[in-house]
């Protein structure tokens, strides 16, 4: 059990990146609140927001954070994974992170575009972010358990 607990501490270094998508997300979701809540989640060591995470500058933020914070997994709260999942996986891989330790929380289509109430949309975005964080933790623990 002690060995498992040591592995858990080593692997749980997650970064959360929340995109404004201009006003597509930020007009309905309180992006700062999502960042604030995500930062409090177990295993999260870095959380930040940016206007366009899919942009070159946004990808550079992800790459730099992976290096500087020694991240083992990332969650990107943004638009549909169909749109930019490959973009974020490539950025993670460029930084030396396993691209399959990237999870997308679709807060544009699932929150911003379908809710008018900011509080409701923000709460749902936080829930989706937490679910994505939990999935990354599970993937990290599973990959480490296989190595034991």
Describe the predicted segments one by one:
Residues 1-148:
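Residues forming the flavin
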């Amino acid at each position: 059990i002690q060995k498992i607990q040591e592995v858990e501490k080593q692997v749980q270094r997650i970064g959360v990146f929340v995109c404004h998508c201009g006003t597509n997300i930020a007009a309905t979701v309180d992006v700062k609140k999502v960042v604030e809540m995500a930062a409090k989640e177990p295993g999260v060591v870095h959380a930040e927001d940016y206007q366009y995470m899919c942009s070159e500058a946004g990808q550079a933020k992800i790459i730099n954070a992976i290096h500087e914070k020694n991240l083992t997994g990332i969650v990107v709260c943004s638009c549909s994974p169909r749109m930019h999942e490959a973009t974020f996986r490539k950025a993670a891989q460029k930084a030396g992170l396993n691209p399959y330790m990237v999870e997308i929380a679709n807060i544009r289509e699932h929150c911003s575009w379908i809710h008018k109430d900011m509080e409701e949309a923000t709460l749902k975005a936080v829930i989706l972010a937490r679910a994505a964080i939990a999935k990354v933790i599970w993937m990290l623990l599973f990959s480490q358990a296989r190595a034991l």
